[in-house]
Structures are given as structure tokens and as C-alpha cells.
């Protein structure tokens, strides 16, 4: 399985390192997943900088960060601690804590995710960004931003802060992917491999359905269903504990140039899943929330240089129980067989925080491998 390709598209010089030294035994990282320690000396923003920041999407209800930004740390926290999109509860990308440069000692160095902002005109003549894996501990992600001035850092962070955040997110996803390699559902993997695909679905997921959905009636665990033709679908579920996690992978012929647009993917999701996933009330089915928090999409990079369309949204049960939760899907083109492949995860956990569980399930989607990935 090829390693997830991580891109940090920034204009500054980027150096990637692994470990502070060679042959060292690293301690285990401290802190929880999706926590980030920010090491920096704070300073107030100028009024011009405050006015510039106020014009951006960093501070509004959509970003989830609405408190005033008056200093450098506020600016960093506005990005790293912004709300994740399309979540039923308010949950940030990262839980952010801060220490000053003087406070950053050996007690803090093993922290799992560290962002160091070093502003020093005596040491630096230009801004540089360096990223490291397993520098003081393992697993650890470390990003250093070195700059001669506060003004240069503010301009840089406004333009590239979200890319830095994405790098940290990708580090967490990569760690989770490595964990899945040690324990996969052999039945689910064999089903996908028979279609020319591969995916690391964990062994604690159970195969619910594997079928070709066509004009004829097919069987689900609950109801006979009839769906549009030429859709091959695998549905797996982990219903252990207080949270339910589901994975669906479905493919269909590539026939429409609009396939990778949000309206098309929304319609295809509704057409397939509404006929497959039902609830206990007769006539109920899986739907998508379009009014309160519509789905959002973006292009992402998976495998090495392959592209996928990511969709995030909220699912809900229609004509039945008051059930719903977040979902994430990746859609790619199988270039060898001319088929579209969508892998989606969705969660149900009433009243519980879901960010970490969703990210863990999302990491499964990144392991999807299509025929062209093995040819490279």
C-alpha cells in the first residue's frame, strides 16, 4: 500500500527532516490526537494588521472562530482551532495550547504535534518553514517557522496558515493508516480485490452487504431493494460500543463529464444510499442534509500523485427516526476500467463528540487503492 502523499504547498523554503539525530531511541509522544502545542512569544497586532485580518474568513461564524484577533497567538489559534466543517457539534480542527519560547523545555518537547514560531531579526534574514517527523519523540510532527519580523510572519500566516494546519492533519491521518495495516478485515479486502481495488478496512468492521445493484431485486440485511443498474456496492459496519461507524464503497461507469461536481455527487449519493441504507421504520432511508449545513467539497491528493474529490456533509434518516451525523467521501476515477469509485464513511453517536472518530474513519478512505496506483 503506497504511502499517503503529503503536500505542503508554501512559498517559503521547506526542509523535511526525520529525527533529531541518527541511531537515537525516541521516547513515546505525549498528548492526545488532534492536539497541537504552539511555541511562540506573543505580541499585539498593529491596527492595520487587525483591519486586514477582519476582512478575511478567519473570523466569522462559518469558520467557527469569532473572538477578536488582537495578537499573534490569536491569529495562529484562529486557523489551528477553527471549527471543522459539516459537524453536528462545534469541534475544532485541533485543541490548541500555547507556551512561550522560554517555557518550552524538555517536559514539552515530546508533545505529539508542535508548531514553533521563532521571530528573531538577529538570527534570520528571511522567512523559512521547516517540517520534521519524529524529532524529539515518536510519533511526532514538528513545524518550525523562522522569520525576522512579526510583520512578515503575519502576512505569511494569513496566506499559508491553513496549509500548515492541513500538514498536521495529514500527519495524524498517516499515523492512523499505519495502524490499520496491522489489522484488516480479510473478507472485505478480498471483495474489493476481486474488483481490482484494495482498501484497509479494519477487522472490527463487519461486512453488511456486497452486491451488484441493478434492476433486479437484491437482498440487504433488512429489506429487499431495487436500485439503478450497474452499481457495485460494499457496505461494512462497526457497531461496537456507543458509536456506530460505517464504510460504503460503490462504483459505477464513468459516463458524465459532470461526475466530479458537487451536485452530481450529491445526487448519486442519494440515489444509491437511499435505496440501500434504511432504518427500523418502514419506508425510512438514508438522506443528505441540504438546508441547515449543505455538503462542501474540495480537491485532495491521495496515494502519491492521484487526485480525489472530497465531500463533507451531514446525513440523516428520512421518513423515520431522528438520526443523523457527519459523513466524508472520496471519489476517484478508475482509469483502467473506466469506473467511478466512491468510498464514504459516516458516523452515528447521539450527543457525543465525533471529530476524532470521524478522522480515524476518514483515514480508511485514504487507503483506497485503484488499478492505476499499482501500475506506477
Residue spans for each PLM region:
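C-terminal motif of bacterial Sec signal peptides marking the signal peptidase cleavage site
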Residues: 14-17
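Surface-exposed amphipathic alpha-helical segments
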Residues: 152-178, 339-376
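Short, well-ordered beta-strand elements
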Residues: 140-149, 245-252, 338-348
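Secretory pathway targeting signatures of secreted, lumenal, and periplasmic proteins
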Residues: 37-39, 53-67, 204-280
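Bacterial lipoprotein signal-peptidase II cleavage site
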Residues: 19-25
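Positively charged n-region of N-terminal signal peptides that target proteins for export
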Residues: 1-4
Amino acid at each position: 500500500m503506497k504511502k499517503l502523499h503529503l503536500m505542503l504547498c508554501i512559498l517559503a523554503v521547506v526542509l523535511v527532516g526525520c529525527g533529531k539525530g541518527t541511531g537515537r531511541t525516541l521516547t513515546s509522544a505525549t498528548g492526545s490526537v488532534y492536539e497541537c502545542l504552539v511555541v511562540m512569544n506573543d505580541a499585539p497586532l498593529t491596527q492595520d494588521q487587525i483591519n486586514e485580518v477582519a476582512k478575511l474568513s478567519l473570523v466569522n461564524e462559518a469558520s467557527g472562530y469569532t473572538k477578536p484577533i488582537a495578537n499573534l497567538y490569536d491569529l495562529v489559534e484562529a486557523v489551528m482551532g477553527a471549527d471543522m466543517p459539516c459537524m453536528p457539534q462545534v469541534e475544532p480542527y485541533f485543541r490548541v495550547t500555547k507556551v512561550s519560547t522560554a517555557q518550552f523545555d524538555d517536559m514539552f518537547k515530546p508533545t505529539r504535534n508542535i508548531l514553533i514560531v521563532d521571530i528573531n531579526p538577529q538570527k534570520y534574514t528571511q522567512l523559512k518553514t521547516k517540517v520534521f517527523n519524529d524529532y524529539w519523540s515518536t510519533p511526532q510532527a514538528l513545524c518550525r517557522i523562522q522569520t525576522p519580523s512579526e510583520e512578515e510572519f503575519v502576512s505569511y500566516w494569513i496566506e499559508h496558515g491553513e496549509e500548515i494546519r492541513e500538514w498536521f492533519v495529514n500527519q495524524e491521518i498517516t499515523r492512523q493508516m499505519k495502524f490499520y495495516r496491522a489489522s484488516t478485515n480479510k473478507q472485505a479486502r478480498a471483495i474489493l480485490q476481486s474488483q481490482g481495488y484494495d482498501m484497509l478496512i479494519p477487522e472490527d468492521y463487519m461486512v453488511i452487504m456486497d452486491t451488484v445493484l441493478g434492476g433486479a431485486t437484491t437482498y440487504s440485511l433488512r429489506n429487499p431493494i431495487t436500485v439503478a443498474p450497474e452499481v457495485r456496492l460494499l457496505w461494512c459496519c462497526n457497531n461496537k460500543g456507543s458509536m456506530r461507524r460505517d464504510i460504503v464503497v460503490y462504483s459505477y461507469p464513468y459516463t458524465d463529464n459532470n461526475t466530479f461536481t458537487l451536485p452530481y455527487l450529491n445526487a448519486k449519493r442519494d440515489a444509491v444510499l437511499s435505496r440501500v441504507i434504511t432504518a427500523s421504520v418502514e419506508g425510512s432511508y438514508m438522506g443528505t442534509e441540504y438546508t441547515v449545513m449543505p455538503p462542501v467539497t474540495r480537491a485532495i491528493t491521495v496515494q502519491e500523485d492521484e487526485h480525489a474529490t472530497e465531500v463533507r456533509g451531514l446525513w440523516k434518516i428520512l421518513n423515520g427516526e431522528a438520526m443523523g451525523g457527519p459523513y466524508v467521501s472520496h471519489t476517484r476515477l478508475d482509469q483502467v476500467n473506466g469506473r467511478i469509485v466512491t468510498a464514504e464513511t459516516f458516523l452515528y453517536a447521539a450527543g457525543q463528540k465525533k471529530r476524532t472518530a470521524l478522522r480515524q474513519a476518514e483515514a480508511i478512505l485514504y487507503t483506497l487503492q485503484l488499478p492505476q496506483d499499482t501500475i506506477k
